[in-house]
């Protein structure tokens, strides 16, 4: 579609595309604060409006996907970097229990709903249930901004997210292997060994590498680039091991946690660049995936969407409630855990 001389829709000029996204990132908080709409939600809505299913101003091309992937990894890395390690160890059992709750409850409800309500096959129902069980930390910047990132409930929710995402991806790997007939003994040995080696490599060697680098390099730019290298290296190692890359980014954050003090200039740079560029690009990219017209094409789409929304909300609330009752948490902490576990993106697509 031709607008002006040399300007067509969707925008092809990289300068115009980048300018438009920067204007959205700049204007969104100014407008949305007056409307009492959360900043993160506003960026997702903006992505839906300008994306291929909206006004078609910008395509979700490789540059948007790259920036969005970096943003999601950045969120997971920051959650690991912000973690109070002593509190994380203290609440490790609670995170494990919550992770099992928030994986098993949605998994069970998802399989039943997929098979009996939606009429899917058993394998399709299990895959759908895996999407129910998985979650991300998309709202972590809000939690960090509110100053509750080190609260016990947040620690439990973050740890539980890693557990449930790991289990969900392993489930996906197993189902794919079963469908293709590759679940022999070597499949299980290879999967188990690769996961253990990946976790051990990141948690044991990353701190040593980081300590050596920070000791021998004092250049601010080089230190920040080194951190980015560690984030993406951890994510890729997790991918090679058969895990979700966000797990590797989170482990990289935990591994470098003690090397980057909370009030250090490097930490300020990490948070600034993430909150200003990477994370907003990710949220806008998520919005571009939304095709609102799909809800009006046929009754089946509305039915599937309604079942997913109701069951995911119910399952995650039940998991948060069970966690509260098990560990005698307050109702506010239950609400925080529930809110943190309802966050979904396209991480399993």
Where are these regions (language model features)?
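Membrane-interface helix termini and inter-helical loops of multi-pass transporters
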Residues: 2-12, 55-62, 114-119, 177-190, ...
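Structural signature of hydrophobic alpha-helical transmembrane segments
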Residues: 6-20, 60-77, 121-136, 189-201, ...
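Alpha-helical transmembrane segments of multi-pass membrane proteins, especially transporters
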Residues: 21, 39, 43-44, 94-103, ...
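Transmembrane alpha-helical segments of multi-pass membrane transport proteins and ion-pumping complexes
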Residues: 21-30, 48, 52, 70-74, ...
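Transmembrane alpha-helices that form the ion-translocation and gating core
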Residues: 31, 85, 90-149, 289-346
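Membrane-interface junctions of multi-pass transporters
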Residues: 31-37, 49-94, 211-219, 223-306, ...
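Small-residue-rich segments of transmembrane alpha-helices in multi-pass membrane proteins
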Residues: 43-52, 97-111, 159-173, 220-237, ...
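Membrane-interface alpha-helices at helix entry/exit sites of multi-pass transporters
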Residues: 90, 149-165, 170, 185-189, ...
């Amino acid at each position: 579609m031709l607008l002006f001389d040399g300007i067509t829709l969707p925008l092809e000029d990289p300068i115009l595309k980048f300018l438009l996204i920067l204007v959205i990132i700049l204007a969104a908080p100014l407008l949305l604060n007056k409307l009492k709409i959360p900043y993160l939600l506003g960026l997702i809505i903006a992505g839906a409006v300008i994306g291929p299913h909206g006004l078609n101003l910008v395509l979700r091309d490789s540059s948007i996907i790259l920036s969005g992937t970096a943003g999601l990894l950045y969120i997971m890395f920051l959650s690991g970097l912000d973690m109070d390690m002593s509190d994380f160890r203290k609440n490790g059992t609670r995170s494990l229990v919550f992770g099992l709750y928030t994986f098993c409850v949605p998994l069970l409800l998802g399989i039943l709903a997929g098979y009996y309500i939606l009429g899917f096959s058993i394998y399709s129902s299990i895959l759908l249930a895996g999407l129910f069980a998985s979650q991300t930390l998309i709202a972590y910047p809000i939690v960090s901004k509110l100053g509750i990132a080190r609260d016990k409930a947040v620690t439990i929710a973050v740890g539980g997210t890693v557990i449930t995402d790991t289990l969900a991806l392993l489930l996906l790997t197993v189902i794919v292997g079963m469908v293709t007939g590759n679940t022999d003994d070597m499949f299980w040995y290879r999967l188990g060994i690769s996961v253990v080696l990946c976790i051990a490599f990141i948690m044991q060697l990353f701190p040593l590498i980081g300590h050596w680098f920070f000791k021998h390099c004092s250049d601010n730019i080089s230190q920040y680039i080194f951190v980015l290298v560690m984030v993406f290296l951890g994510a890729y190692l997790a991918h090679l091991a058969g895990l979700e890359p966000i797990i590797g980014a989170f482990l990289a954050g935990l591994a470098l946690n003690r090397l980057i003090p909370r009030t250090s200039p490097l930490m300020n740079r990490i948070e600034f660049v993430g909150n200003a560029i990477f994370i907003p690009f990710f949220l806008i990219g998520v919005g571009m995936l939304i095709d609102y017209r799909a809800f009006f094409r046929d009754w089946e789409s509305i039915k599937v969407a309604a079942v997913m929304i109701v069951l995911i909300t119910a399952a995650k609330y039940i998991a948060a409630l069970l966690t509260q009752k098990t560990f005698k948490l307050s109702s506010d902490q239950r609400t925080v855990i529930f809110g943190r576990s309802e966050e979904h993106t396209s991480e399993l697509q």
